[in-house]
């Protein structure tokens, strides 16, 4: 039982409206696991201004791409895959100067590439423009040199179903022959991407309903600091990404 079960509505209202800080209200009253303080996050500038909640009807998770309000049906999709002890797959599109992350798909063991691809294929089956520009963790290129071409495997799993029949999708691997991005550079880039006003990069918006795992990962990724001589280097502590 959490405190919300035993407190009166008036007490809850007062606690929410100023008696407690929001993170303390979530932890003490609702029994929610608290997030990180903003000042120790790797994605320091990510906030409510980067989220939207009207991406699907009634604020409920979409069960098909036809329920995504901001999906451009006649345009290709961008996808980003992270290869780790779980597979994470986010899908987005850019319209004008706004980039929207529309959907988050993931797969945990024993599921793997086939299962992840099947989730994507089911959800985006009605999408008219069956082109996917796939970006991935550059470490995927390292796997390829070791004879485990993860990027090629997910491409093949999307372009052909479990019976080897072509699905109609064309996947373009966008990260071939690209080296890993140092975390210090990623930190600087994300600061630039997420800051408001007067920037050349597009405005970032994430569907907080259909990408809740991504939002959680961003908000719970802590930053660490190490030194190379007198140079301070910010890096991402990846314990929040483990199962």
Predicted regions and their residues:
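Solvent-exposed strand-loop boundary residues in beta-sheet-rich modules
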Residues: 95-97
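ATPase catalytic-site recognition across NTP-hydrolyzing enzymes
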Residues: 2-79
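A short acidic Gly-Thr/Ser loop motif
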Residues: 80-86
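Mg2+-dependent endonuclease catalytic cores in nucleic-acid-processing enzymes, primarily RNase H-like
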Residues: 99-238
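Short beta-strand scaffold segments in enzyme catalytic cores
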Residues: 87-93
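Glycine-rich phosphate-binding/hydrolytic loop that grips phosphoryl groups
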Residues: 243
